[in-house]
């Protein structure tokens, strides 16, 4: 390679994909032998011995996981020391239930991580040793002291909940995802630190695991009666609602893959997701914030505690902020510095994040507070103490995101595609070998793709890919050209034994999309995904691989308990604009192609709107009414839910119609109903 890092694509592809080399980002074996997967003679028998049972780690997986011990210093116990430091109290076992006894959060499910007399259990063959170590540290739960006056309850949900002692009560940071979990955490604090009221709440950013448990510690009535400040970054409310509504159904289904919702915890199942032990499944709530922070340097004094806020929009969330506590010399880093490589793109789906901005905000935090800070702490994982330690922590974390952003841009400017770059970039040893820069949540590979997407979008400029065939149609033509499917499977079986799991997964999944009833293809694809999962260092990658394997073997488990139902509180926070946008999303344009309506919406508690439906499209104007409207609907803002939910009883109670009496029926008869349990690894 020359000094300007110019890459010959053909050499790169041949060297990377054909070797079956260990991919450092996921510690997974990948490769291909595309030339060996051609057509075979008609009538070849299917490979024997394929079953729907989970398999042990294969030889190549064993080798990949064993190589991790040579890569990382497992004698370095500093992160474990930080994770255990300051423990005040913890129950012997932790399982949190809702009002009807359903388990919504369990650390008992991960008891297999515990060793005798507190000694850690060694990693099994079916787990990447680095991820196993992370899971053991995230399995720690209880009440911890950060400094005198700042306390965290960790391991009671995916997120940490933080309690800052004021003169009369607690200022709470990020009240978890579920009310049941935050209530249990607050009870633990009260038991060991005394009874004190909540006197303020800071929610660092609008992801549900950082605000959904708010009603477990306060009520709306309490907030109003005691004027409790609910402090958030500007833009919090809009993003909190929009992210969970517009693409909520698809995000919810995909989140099941990311978080391992359908998997049992265990050595062959789900472990840590890198920033916690998965998502709780309790009651999600929302209370509208009442104090917005708009600019870095703004301060608030709540219950005698002075806080200075550092705005970091476009990092881990579109609206996010760090907090500096000068009297404690403590720096709260929200979810911007979490002891692992985070996501520039999240597998459940979301807008991509800006790696360059993320790095710059971390360096800005260091410049503003690094000279004085004695501890950094955040919403996931554990604090880091010591001025030298935390400054190095901030710099190394910033360097990860900056490296990925810069190197992706360097290679894309040489013409490499997103997928090529993802297989090429690897963190330098100075970054890769630190325990807090490991790829437990995000990976270099999919973060590089996020950078490519941010700057270049989905298109790689190859016109062959400009309007590619849908996967099912393409797969059928591939299968037709390949010929005898059993001959393809026989060759795939050979490649499986050689450890080319990614290629085997790709070619067998092609056969599945061509014919979903091809059971040998399904089972071999599942086996390949399973081995990729066993070797993955990223918790979400492991979950995705193992969930795909599970669904190929047994189909989609459509048990309603797995369905992401959303939060009524979040839905009630929707503005009229959001509701009307969502009406347009729900409208089946083909079915409503001939529908032509103009409707006045006379909200009793909001500005009026004119709603136009034309050519299958919903358009609206705020602050207007049409003289020639087909009808006028008088309703409260929340009455729109009667339309969106097609609830005729609620419509009759909440909506007054003047004009066309059938207008509500016309608006709702072509609204789509979403199937939550849609297929992912098969057509």
Model-derived features with residue positions:
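Feature captures hydrophobic
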Residues: 36-38, 43-46, 491-494, 500-506, ...
